[in-house]
Amino acid sequence: MSPEKYLNFFKETADKKFQWLKEELSKIRTGRPNPKLFDNLLVESYGDRMPMVALAQIAVNPPREIVIKPFDVKNNINAIYSEIQRANLGVQPVIDGDKIRINFPPMTQESRLESIKQAKKVVEQIHQELRSVRRDTLQMIKKDDHKDEDFEEFLKEEVEKVNKQYIAQLETIQKQKEKELLVV
């Protein structure tokens, strides 16, 4: 059995976790407006629930404003407006002719600290899931009952090396997010 089987299992699973982490961290509000905040909003339109990004162009208007311009203003502007209000994002949308403007107030120190706490919680969840993936990989190695104990130890060491790389990457991502949140 080649070491790649185990390392690929570990890496593929960990990469999926990191993709989820990046998506979750992008949803945490920072001092700057982020269009990704609206990626998961589903708007009632044309008799179905559709992603907002399929119904409107979302653009940042520096320094603290997002402008949402529906492709079909007549049919969708009110539905988009209502969904933003319902989503409880801590912002107040304003309909301005054929577009919706959303001003992001500056974050207070309290809201920054709350966002940092939220980011740490998400990172810790991934940290726990990485431990679980590592454990599952090590159990796969053990279950496959290698005749050569040295080879089994080699595999375990390789998994640990890769795990340490992911942990370091996780810490870097957390520090970057905290730095981003602390910028005034």
Swiss-Prot record:
Name a Pfam family for this protein. Answer: RRF
- InterPro entries for this protein: Ribosome_recyc_fac (IPR002661), Ribosome_recyc_fac_dom (IPR023584), RRF_sf (IPR036191)
What are the GO cellular component annotations? Answer: cytoplasm
GO:BP terms for this protein? translational termination
Keyword flag Protein biosynthesis? yes
Sorted keywords for this record are: Cytoplasm, Protein biosynthesis
HAMAP family according to UniProt:
RRF
Q: Could you identify this protein by its name? A: Ribosome-recycling factor
Q: Which organism is it from?
A: Mycoplasma pneumoniae (strain ATCC 29342 / M129 / Subtype 1) (Mycoplasmoides pneumoniae)
Per the record, the gene is frr
